[in-house]
Amino acid sequence: MNRGPPNPRMFKFQPNPKVKNRFQDEADLRSLRSFKTDFSNYLASDTNFLNVAEIMTSYAYGESNNANEKEIQCDLLTENGGIEIDPTRLSYRERIRWHLQQFCYKTSSHGIPMLGQAPNSLYRAVWVFLLLICAIQFINQAVAVIQKYQKMDKITDIQLKFDTAPFPAITLCNLNPYKDSVIRSHDSISKILGVFKSVMKKAGDSSAEASDDGVEYDMDGITIQAKRRKRGAGEKGTFEPANSACECDEEDGSNECEEKSTEKPSSDNDMCICAFDRQTNDAWPCHRREQWTNTTCQACDEHYLCSKKAKKGTKRSEIKKEPCICESKGLFCIKHEHAALVLNLWEYFGDTEEFSDISTEEREALGFGNMTDEVAIVTKAKENIIFAMSASEEQRILMSQAKHNLIHKCSFNGKPCDIDKDFELVADPTFGNCFVFNHDREIFKSSVRAGPQYGLRVMLFVNASDYLPTSEAVGIRLTIHDKDDFPFPDTFGYSAPTGYISSFGMRMKKMSRLPAPYGDCVEDGTTSNYIYKGYAYSTEGCYRTCFQELIIDRCGCSDPRFPSIGGVQPCQVFNKNHRECLEKHTHQIGEIHGSFKCRCQQPCNQTIYTTSYSEAIWPSQALNISLGHCEKEAEECNEEYKENAAMLEVFYEALNFEVLAESEAYGIVKMMADFGGHLGLWSGVSVMTCCEFVCLVLELLYMAVTHHITQERIRRRENAANEF
């Protein structure tokens, strides 16, 4: 079979040096060299070529084809006069060289074959230079591609979907956490409210002194210059004389004293009599006891303010003599039965300094200190109540408002609700009993249409007459959240007042974030130490978990405003060390340069509800229906519900919703495409070319391994022969 002339570059005849030395003359050597160029001439010549058998007789054993010491290498002579070299018969180095040359001839990479086929050194140098330039340019581009990929950039796609949006969970709470009529039986709460009342009274006195403007008080045409005006003194109630501890300043000649109504006088010399109004808790004016005189007045008004003489022009028949008590100058008199007991203000206000069941350390633990700002005092009192009620959740539930007492009427999608089944109780430390609508995760609820008629409409009764003195506002706390999320009404809630219908229009947004390495969001589920068990992870819950861990570690107790960890007992309300430690670390965690930092990532999947709010007066005068559990006349019920009830509407403003999804801006596929594009542009290399290089490396490794194995076998045979 004629295979055609072989490529001359594929063959190189290299006689074994041992064979070369056996040639008898120079003519035989020249004939041997001519063998690689003209096989037919050599066969026809009369050259005295050594017989192979003659050579072989000098060896005691046969040689391996891979042996470096072999003196004869046999190559195939083709029919058309060419040589087809068997690479397995070449020496180790020649075999590697032969493989590299063959790779240069056959590779699909651009430029490399030009090196193997270069006719001279200059031609080869030019191609080496071109290959280096292209390789450098490719490396620069490859580095830029890799750096772009390592940035892990992402893009946010915004889509507006017109589909049925799931209705969220709605949490409803009374702004008053506990019923005043019930909670006062709690010993700790009774102490806290007593101290709170006293501190608020002192703060009011301080505010009144600070706002003194010398207002004149006029009675019967007689002007009295007031040294100070008490809080609420402009609102006249019913006055009566009352004993109080006082500080008197007699230098200004007015003989007027400053009352200290919450302090018990140490002696009779420190006691004075004041005109006291129970409605406003004002005690003014005050004078020493000896400056007041029991007498008879001719005119007293409905506020029990009297004058010794009747006004001019008053008929004798209209003059009514009333028992009264007047200060020495007779300018100020109060109606008073002489035999009646005089009220002691320190007993009326329940002087906190005289509490036999509360120690100094306990009072200090409450944290009121020298507070004079009423807003700050109320905030601290609310915190103290949370601490005092932290022991038993069952007790908190009983002292807070029950479900049917709060929720009177309800409808969803225009149909009545089942209050027992549709609302679930959640005990919140700040707001007491809260009730969640649409809590069941297995039941899908959605609005049929947009608008208030197809959302949640609920009427709530808060019973303002049973509010704690620390409850500053009357109304409802509402939180809109996903079913899987804890509501956090103290952080994310909205307040709705009584006497109004409050409308909350919603729009839903779904967020889908990328996890690492493109972002640092927390994937579905919760972290191992998340304190809100049974709820999905949220950033707020993470911060509270982090803070709770800090408090437990530093203070040895847990913050009662958050769920505890590992059964650790909450910090006690009257434990001074607990309260000071908690307050210290609460301030530290909020400092910019604080030593303790909480790192909380966003959840990868999150549903956000944006809300718009509007309100209108409710109920209207035309609403002549029986509201809730009111059994009075319609007008009376309307008035009662204006003060104690609120109407809420929660609905979708539109049935479409936004989907914000993050995606990788430059992923691995794009990187490989750009990488391959630059590789093909500058080097002409493809994936198949890379496979060629891989095969070359594998062949070279295989040759190296087999060579070392063969060498080891030869050494062993030689050692065995020598020993023999």
Curated annotation (Swiss-Prot):
Q: Which residue ranges does the entry give as Cytoplasmic-facing topology?
A: 1-125, 706-724
Task: Look up the record and report any one GO term of the cellular component aspect.
Answer: cell body membrane
User: GO biological process annotations for this chain's record?
Assistant: detection of mechanical stimulus involved in sensory perception of touch; mechanosensory behavior; positive regulation of detection of mechanical stimulus involved in sensory perception of touch; positive regulation of mechanosensory behavior; sodium ion transmembrane transport
Membrane-side (Extracellular) residue stretches:
147-684
Q: Which residues are glycosylated?
A: 294, 370, 463, 605, 624
**Which of UniProt's keywords are assigned here?**
Cell membrane, Glycoprotein, Ion channel, Ion transport, Membrane, Sensory transduction, Sodium, Sodium channel, Sodium transport, Transmembrane, Transmembrane helix, Transport
The family database entries (Pfam families) matched by this protein are listed as: ASC, Mec-4_10_cyt
UniProt-listed PROSITE patterns:
ASC
Q: How does it assemble?
A: The channel is probably composed of at least the mec-2, mec-4, mec-6 and mec-10 subunits.
Alphabetical list of PANTHER family matching this protein: AMILORIDE-SENSITIVE SODIUM CHANNEL-RELATED, DEGENERIN MEC-10
Q: What is this protein called?
A: Degenerin mec-10
Q: Which organism is it from?
A: Caenorhabditis briggsae
Please spell out the taxonomic lineage of the organism that makes this protein. Eukaryota, Metazoa, Ecdysozoa, Nematoda, Chromadorea
